[in-house]
């Protein structure tokens, strides 16, 4: 018995247990905010590794892990503010180079500065004109995925009259790969162009677009229409006869008729001509235009 008359049990004193209610056990009244956030119902957040390069151009520069057996990357969907334009039909006019979204991130685009370009939903990598398109290929990527360019050329078909395969040479020994690509381009009726840097590849794309509306006269040989120029062009087709010799012959004989009628000795007496040139000229003047079968 203690001083207050409470009976104490015999033996060692026992410890009392206290239960402290937690926020999970007690239902808070409406409108009350808990002091601590409960960790019982937090959702599990799964961490995923950062995505690797998703475009073909980024892959060509960095290369994904997995070697040659890695799956070929597919370009990501464009953002809302970067939605590509609708695909222009072959033959439609455009002032810009239309770039496929799969080329997003390609360093070549940084060097396309002299002509405008924009993303568009197109089948080739670059649409350079009404009837001109280009596919871009890195040799490093081609060595890992040799079937890639076969599928691209097959899907492209004959939609464009001029199909360019723009190859960036970024490997040490490109001879064998270029030999195979050259054979492929012959069979696919495709033009093969080699670039050794992204800057050079960008200049090729710019040039194709800038010269889209230019006539072919810039690439053709300019022929003079006056008589002396035409005779000079004709005489210089004879081996070792140059423009100076042609002018000397015209000055000496006065006309093309008298020049053709001259003997071999008369031709050899012209200054700077000599017997060898005279013999060649004489043989050309007196041989038939068509060989008569014997």
Curated annotation (Swiss-Prot):
GO terms for biological process: double-strand break repair; mitotic recombination; negative regulation of telomere maintenance; nucleotide-excision repair; response to oxidative stress; UV-damage excision repair. Ubiquitinated with both 'Lys-48' and 'Lys-63' linkages. Deubiquitinated by USP45. InterPro entries: ERCC1-like_central_dom, ERCC1/RAD10/SWI10, Restrct_endonuc-II-like, RuvA_2-like. Residues 130-152 bind DNA. Residues 1-99 are annotated as: Disordered. One of its GO terms (molecular function) is damaged DNA binding. It is found in: Nucleus. It holds the Pfam family HHH_5. Residues 220-294 are annotated as: HhH2, dimerization with ERRC4/XPF. A motif (Nuclear localization signal) lies at residues 13-19. CDD domains: ERCC1_C-like. There is a cross-link at residues 17, 33, 239 (Glycyl lysine isopeptide (Lys-Gly) (interchain with G-Cter in SUMO2)). GO terms for cellular component: chromosome, telomeric region; ERCC4-ERCC1 complex; nucleotide-excision repair complex; nucleotide-excision repair factor 1 complex. Residues 38-47 have a biased composition (Polar residues). Keywords: DNA damage, DNA repair, DNA-binding, Isopeptide bond, Nucleus, Ubl conjugation. Belongs to the ERCC1/RAD10/SWI10 family. Heterodimer composed of ERCC1 and ERRC4/XPF. Interacts with USP4. PANTHER family: DNA EXCISION REPAIR PROTEIN ERCC-1, EXCISION REPAIR CROSS-COMPLEMENTING 1 ERCC1. Non-catalytic component of a structure-specific DNA repair endonuclease responsible for the 5'-incision during DNA repair. Responsible, in conjunction with SLX4, for the first step in the repair of interstrand cross-links (ICL). Participates in the processing of anaphase bridge-generating DNA structures, which consist in incompletely processed DNA lesions arising during S or G2 phase, and can result in cytokinesis failure. Also required for homology-directed repair (HDR) of DNA double-strand breaks, in conjunction with SLX4. This is DNA excision repair protein ERCC-1. It comes from Bos taurus (Bovine).
